[in-house]
Amino acid sequence: MKDSIINKLESLSERHEELQALLGDPSVINDQDKFRAYSKEYSQLEEVVTTFNRWKKLNSDIEEAQILLDDPDMKEMAAEEIAENKAEIENLEQHLQILLLPKDPNDEYNAFLEIRAGTGGDEAGIFAGDLYRMYSRYCESKRWRIEEMSANESEQGGYKEIIVKISGEGVYGQLKFESGGHRVQRVPKTESQGRIHTSACTVAVMPELPESEMPEINPTDLRIDTYRSSGAGGQHVNTTDSAVRITHIPTGIVVECQDERSQHKNKAKALAVLASRIVQVEQERQAAEQADTRRNLLGSGDRSDKIRTYNYPQGRVTDHRINLTVYRLDEVMNGKIDELIQPIITEYQADQLAALSEQA
């Protein structure tokens, strides 16, 4: 392992010890804001320090075992121990490099998940409902909480658009690679000839920003319209103008919310989503500027950015970004999507490591 990496790990170990002492300091214990901040930093360093300590111990054990190589009675056992330790050290070094990769500060945040029906008419709306069910099941398995922000139901079932907030540990970091175009190939229930149709939905995942990080939005840049909440088919389900539509004039971003009976609550929810969308648009612009030399696995949420195909006749799901295909469509649609999410995260980390190597 490079000296620069070892030096970085040593400094993190020192910081870990320093934090341990601070967390036992009465003045810190009595200051809840400081205590929370130090506790969070301490827990974030825990894995890297534990792994580094293991790495150091194995290297020390190898040095001791090498002395025994001169002893005929111990030579075979020592050689075996050295080989085992070297294999583990190799794995630990790779893991440590991943742990040292720059962290996306948004990864620990809650997230807004937006699913919009695209091409395909009613079938696209039904597929949007299927995707929402898939993500809901996944969230249940992670014990994350889902709160509906806005839903525009489709007449044949499913949704024209649905936005939910997902709360839990590391939600955005786990789901951010789901952004992009999702395509389905299947025979619709309404298809009498048995022909396979292709429909599409767009998924966008945005971090829920804390108030301190929300962009300043000039009230004069907003157009706020109110109207009566409506269900599938357009029928009104409320007698007051509680639904809210907010347009951010400079960017053209439009957010609607009609989930709550209170206009005030709908407005607050819509503003929270709007703030995240504005930040996302700016981040996408910056990413596009940097994407000339390196591929971007983070989907843009653009309809043309096709990331995944769900093929029902063949029972397969294909992720086009890394050419991954799994033949467990039923399990995937029931929320077992870790086998799609984790390979993308691993590939992203590999790209980051490659970029760091080029800079070194």
Swiss-Prot record:
Annotated stretches, region: Disordered: 285-309
Modified residues (N5-methylglutamine): 235
SUPFAM superfamilies: Release factor (SSF75620)
UniProt feature, compositional bias: Basic and acidic residues: 285-295
Post-translational modification: Methylated by PrmC. Methylation increases the termination efficiency of RF1.
Any GO molecular function: translation release factor activity, codon specific
SMART domains referenced in this protein's UniProt entry, alphabetically: PCRF
Subcellular location: Cytoplasm
InterPro entries named in the record: PCRF, Pep_chain_release_fac_I, Pep_chain_release_fac_I_sf, Prokaryotic/Mito_RF, RF-1
Keywords, alphabetical: Cytoplasm, Methylation, Protein biosynthesis
Similarity-based family: Belongs to the prokaryotic/mitochondrial release factor family.
Function according to Swiss-Prot or TrEMBL: Peptide chain release factor 1 directs the termination of translation in response to the peptide chain termination codons UAG and UAA.
Protein name: Peptide chain release factor 1
Annotated organism of origin: Actinobacillus pleuropneumoniae serotype 7 (strain AP76)
Gene name of the record: prfA
